Each structure stands twice: as C-alpha cells, then as structure tokens.
Amino acid sequence: MAVTDVFARRATLRRSLRLLADFRYEQRDPARFYRTLAADTAAMIGDLWLATHSEPPVGRTLLDVGGGPGYFATAFSDAGVGYIGVEPDPDEMHAAGPAFTGRPGMFVRASGMALPLADDSVDICLSSNVAEHVPRPWQLGTEMLRVTKPGGLVVLSYTVWLGPFGGHEMGLSHYLGGARAAARYVRKHGHPAKNNYGSSLFAVSAAEGLRWAAGTGAALAVFPRYHPRWAWWLTSVPVLREFLVSNLVLVLTP
C-alpha cells in the first residue's frame, strides 16, 4: 500500500472547500481556525501511519516542530498519540491564552533548526506551516529526520511562496515582491505584518522542497495538502505547481 492510499480517500472536494472556508478565521479567530486544522491534521497523520504500518498511531510519540501554543495537542491526544510541542517564541507559546492552559502534552521552547532531542527519539515528526517562517527550512527538515526513529514518519508541510496564500496577511500583494509587499503593509496598517517578509516570512518554493526531499533518499510521497485527490497531479508540473499548489506536504521515513 502506498503511503497516501488511505488519506487519498479523505482528500475530497468537500474537505477542501470546508478548510478553505475556515481560512477566513485565521487572523480574527485563530482558536476556531486551528481547531479545524488540528483535527484535519491529526486525521491526515493517522491515515499516513496506518498506510505504512497497518495500524493506527495509538501509543506513538509525535513531535510538533513549531507547534505554537499547542492548538494541535488536544487533537493528537484525543487520537491516542503522545504529543511534544517545540516552539522558539515565548509569545507564540502563550498566544492562545487561558483556553489552552490545560492542554495535554509536553512543551519545549527551542528552535526547529536545532532540536534538543537525541537521535531516533520520536515515532512521528510533524512540521505544519513552519518552514516558510525560518531562514533555513531544510536545516529544519534535516533535524526532523535526525530525531525520528528508523521506520517512523516525517511530515513537513509548508506554504508555497507563489501560491495564493504565500503572502499570509499581506494578501496577494506578495506577487509584487516580498519587500514591496511588506512595505505596502506597513503603509496601510502602521506596523509590520506579524509574518514579515525577510524576518519571519521567507520565499520557499515547491521546487526547493521537492529537491531537498529527493536528495535525502528518504522521501515516500509529496502531495498538495488542501487539494482534492484528483488535483494532486499539479505537484508534478514545474512552474504551475508554484502558483497552484498552495501548501506542499513532504512525507519521509528515516
């Protein structure tokens, strides 16, 4: 069975439209948005593990690199997965406020580019929408492979710069260029964007991710995270994938 066979059944147009509808809440109601995304992500990880191990990931340990305040912790705990969140920014760790103070799991303040874990420590290593926020995304990916046990899963998902959501809260102005979009945001709002080009947001292409994954010798699959199964072919078309694959998932095993 291919690693994506189980998840492919879930990757329907209805799911894509539901997730797209919830994106409008990312800035104004992040708890609502991330609960939906967390449930979908936990289901995706469960499907990928089931396809490769013929059993659900119950009792396994997952490391969430760049987990922020732990929005994903409850979803994975509910699935029976042990959760460890890593986040370098103390403000992000507490961004969810009191509603998430009792969240399950373990939380560590550290950089994803220098994970404070021993080699072969976890069963699953996940990074969801983080690679575009660090200056060396493939160093992050290499660290994820290092801490994952042989036969485990590494799932690195990131927003493609030239896709429609590449500019984050800067909107489609990123097509004018990152620096110009950042300056335009400051003029309009009077302060830099949270996801500020050049400091907390970087231009990461689909081609870069595919090249890195292939170079590791550990790649199992690549697919567009939010697209229905019938649109996954887009990842195989150079140039087109940069604009139409909004979020790329790289699945690897050490």
UniProtKB/Swiss-Prot annotation:
Enumerate the InterPro entries for this protein: Methyltransf_11, SAM-dependent_MTases_sf
Q: Which domain of life is it from?
A: Bacteria
Q: What does the UniProt keyword field contain?
A: Methyltransferase, Transferase
Recorded GO MF terms: S-adenosylmethionine-dependent methyltransferase activity
Protein EC: 2.1.1.-
- Respond yes or no to whether keyword Methyltransferase is given for this record: yes
What protein am I looking at? Answer: Uncharacterized methyltransferase Mb0229c
